[in-house]
Amino acid sequence: TVYVYFDTLSNDIQRIKAFYNVRFFRNDIQGKCDSLHYNVADSMVYMRDEPVIWAEDSQLTGDSINIKVKEQTIDNMLMHPNAFVIQQDSIKGFNQVKGKQITAFFKDNEIDNMFNEGNAETIYWLRDDDGSLIGINFSQSATMDIKIKDNQISNIKYYKNIKETLYPEEQLKDNMEYLKGFLWQEDIKPRREEF
């Protein structure tokens, strides 16, 4: 069941358009934007005007977000331009993926992998098997293919113009653990009781 809140609705047989303070809630995914269009013919959801999606521990943003739906589940999600994915690693840490365009591919309603194109950047907190912090990895490349396992980054393949640095926690300076444009928006995440 998906719960949706909006101020204005335009509805015809093939398209649903919701405007102004659009919010939706489903147990495994929540979202917010100012303009949402659903096209029945191609099963596409188009989110505009400061769209934000929360899926499990991840927050996904971009100037626009396009979602492909198959059999009532998300197949893939395109965030562009200014795409940014943030995943809470711990109370203190946030894994981050940033680029001009990020396509997230879903499996069983969870992000399975992401393809990051154009000025791709990541920050992720590298931990050993017992959860102890090894360091914080900063990387940049033209494109990246990022595999996700158990809602955590498990592998990254870098392509072209690769720069990567691993910093022990004690070598971090103020705000080094955040990519430019970082904005954690947990406080505006839709909750079930709002609907």
What are the residue ranges of the model-derived segments?
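Structural signature for solvent-exposed beta-strand/loop edge elements and short helix-capping sites
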Residues: 1-195
